[in-house]
Amino acid sequence: MGNCGRKVLRALSFLLLLGSSSAQGTWEAMLPARLAEKSRAEEVAATGSRQPHADRCPPPPRTLPPGACQATRCQADSECPRHRRCCYNGCAYACLEAVPPPPVLDWLVQPKPRWLGGNGWLLDGPEEVLQAETCSTTEDGAEPLLCPSGYECHILQPGDEAQGIPNHGQCVKQRRQAEGRVLRQRLHKEYPEGDSKNVAEPGKGQQRHFP
């Protein structure tokens, strides 16, 4: 029994030693592959921030431009001059002229929702701004800086009347619902009360015609 037990222990020890060496060999065989995979991941992470920005690239051409495949290739925007981006030219990535970013819409006046009946609401779009047109409603002895017809002065800085600083703003297009009121005010200025020329207002009795 003693000899039999020693043989069994030797056999178990041999099997354990064999399994240990086999596992070590397997790990050593897998180690280069793992290191290579880690190296590729680090390379991708390092170059990820230098990838071309597609939002600044022109759309790819439908037909291949001449010399597109012979152009100097790039892999990142940092390889291109200041006003160029690494973009696809139909054949390869090359330094192309950057596309300007889309314009930003400035909401000068917050639109007010209009009730359409029931649960329906209509939200107006932004007011149209007259390009580079400033205005003021302060009357300091001279004519105020008014807006053209169909526009109203949206005050951006109130100014200070005590110090003689007039307010100023930008001309924005008047809302549709205010057009009738503006027209009546304009006609009232042109034909004040007591003048023979007047116009009829809705619901204000009979209409008086111009002579």
From Swiss-Prot:
GO terms for molecular function: serine-type endopeptidase inhibitor activity. Residues 182-211 are annotated as: Disordered. Disulfide bonds join C57-C87, C69-C91, C74-C86, C80-C95. The keyword Disulfide bond applies. Residues 182-198 have a biased composition (Basic and acidic residues). Pfam families: WAP (PF00095). Residues 50-99 form the WAP domain. It comes from the Eukaryota. It is found in: Secreted. Residues 1-23 form the signal peptide. GO terms for biological process: negative regulation of inflammatory response; negative regulation of wound healing. Has growth inhibitory activity. PANTHER family: WAP FOUR-DISULFIDE CORE DOMAIN PROTEIN 1. This is WAP four-disulfide core domain protein 1. The lineage of its organism: Eukaryota, Metazoa, Chordata, Craniata, Vertebrata. The gene is Wfdc1.
